Amino acid sequence: MSRFFIKGRIRYEHSFRKTDTGQLSFITNAKDDSRKMIYKMNDKKKEKFMKKIISLLLLVTILFSLIGCSSKKGTITIAVPNDSTNEARALLLLESNGIIKLKEDATITATINDIVENPYGIEFKEIEAAQLPNYLRDVDYAIINSNYAISAGLNPITDSILIEGGGSYYANILAVKDGNQENPLVLALLAALNSRQVKDFIDKKYQGSVVSTVENLTDGYDASIDYSALENQTITVACSPTPHGEILNIAKDILASKNITLDIKEYNDYIIPNTVVEDGTILANYFQHLPYLEDFNKNNNTHIVSVGAIHVEPMGLYGGKQTGLDKIYDQNK
């Protein structure tokens, strides 16, 4: 029986044959006759040799299988916001998609300690909300607020794997210190944000990744306000850059037509915009949803109130090391 194999540019032929003494000869001949190797072994040695080869092949096969399983079944990591209301919001998104289960009495301040079922063995990493896009490369998934996703160049509609509905429970609000709700400057800013111009801008600019929640649209102005008395005055408002700062620029143009200046102060965190309103440095802010504000007031003894909901930013699950949910669902296979 003969076999051929190629090594480099030389074609080899090898064959087994029995000698007159009953030994098995393994003969390898180079096609160019430059080499000839003859290995002789008796039947017992041949059998022992073949068993070793088979055992080695089985061992290699098992090792590769284990490596494959290890890669497939590795721990899944999901990064979530570390502030209480947004962490709860992220966990509720996972629960609504059957990935985890929370305690029955879990509220909008639920944390990972309220998880009662974690069938896929997910490891959670609690990260400051604004930093979540920067952690995508280090985790399998991250749950990110739309404003931070947009700022990082992500499209919440096309890039998210899971996304909230457009309900207004987490609508972003215009907020002021308690006692300033009827301030004419505040009412003028609210009317501008409730305008058809702002809604049209949101619809066109964000294509569903930010959704207006205003039901009673205005022309940009409040008929109860004496705008002439507000001429040459300045409204200060704290916000996050995207989308709040962009939306406020539309309101700025509306107010400018009445000779009112809107001074927009942008911040990249969730703390300062509230502290500057509380201490009176800034008149209003526009960056947060009501559950976050209520929790902030409770924990910081502040007195900030909502004067109106403007838009909602659906929170989404984004892929880091993963591009779909297969890694999660494959855990139980």
Which residues does each PLM region occupy?
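Extracytoplasmic "Venus flytrap"
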Residues: D83-E87, A229-A251, Y270-I272
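Ligand-binding clefts/hinges and TM-proximal coupling segments of bilobed small-molecule sensing domains
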Residues: R89, K103-A110, L187-S228, K333
